[in-house]
Amino acid sequence: MSGGSARSLGKGSAPPGPVPEGLIRVYSMRFCPFAQRTLLVLNAKGIRHQVININLKNKPEWFFQKNPSGLVPVLENSQGQLIYESAITCEYLDEAYPGKKLLPDDPYEKACQKMVFELSSKVPPLLIRFIRRENEADCSGLKEELRKEFSKLEEVLTKKKTTYFGGSSLSMIDYLIWPWFERLEALELNECIDHTPKLKLWMAAMMKDPAVSALHIEPRDLRAFNDLYLQNSPEACDYGL
């Protein structure tokens, strides 16, 4: 990997050149949980890649040619093909590159992973609402909603009787939902999983994974980024560099 800790490109910057042969490029942002999904899969599969960080508070004009919505992650290969939307980029990488397969071949097992992904889909917007809350009075209601969503995921693990959501070994679904759980400590929301022992064991197991530990972001850095981002600071995306 190259460029993971490089400063982000913003408005007025020159677009990067063609992607070198043998590499795939990911347009990312160091603190973005959606881009982290893609980076986790790249790392887990050992895919040689180049990271170009984008300043999401001051986006380059040329970036909208990579993704009309102006969001990360975006993949670009040496043929100039572009793939965006985090879950789609992850599935593409698993299908297009050799090595460890993260999605099961069995249609039912693959469908089960997609159902868990849908089941977890309320967690990201709840955490975003929590980060953007205007007063502490909103906290208790949001925490209760999170507890309910985590209870649903706890039930999945209870029924499967496995450590991971896809079975006895780590797979795609675990990487897709992990970035949001990594942020619980920074947001002081660990209390929301006090009633979910299997979910806590899953989190402990995830922390031991090489790809997860390689991309771990310290809670204090996440908090500092969140503070700057909420202030609309153009320096938010480059915090700590």
From Swiss-Prot:
SS bond list: none
Main location: cytoplasm
Keyword Translocase tagged: no
Active site annotation, chain numbering: 32 (nucleophile)
Binding site for glutathione: 59, 72, 85-86
GO terms (BP aspect): cellular response to arsenic-containing substance; glutathione metabolic process; L-ascorbic acid metabolic process; xenobiotic catabolic process
Residue intervals of the GST N-terminal domain: 22-101
Entry comment describing in which tissues the protein is expressed: Most abundant in the liver and skeletal muscle; also expressed in heart, diaphragm, colon, thymus, kidney, lung, ovaries, spleen, intestine and pancreas.
Domain GST C-terminal: 106-225
InterPro entries, alphabetized: Glutathione-S-Trfase_C-like, Glutathione-S-Trfase_C_sf, Glutathione_S-Trfase, Glutathione_S-Trfase_N, GST_C, GST_omega, GST_Omega/HSP26, Thioredoxin-like_sf
Subunit structure: Homodimer.
UniProt similarity note: Belongs to the GST superfamily. Omega family.
Name of this chain's protein: Glutathione S-transferase omega-1
Lineage, broadest ranks: Eukaryota, Metazoa, Chordata, Craniata, Vertebrata
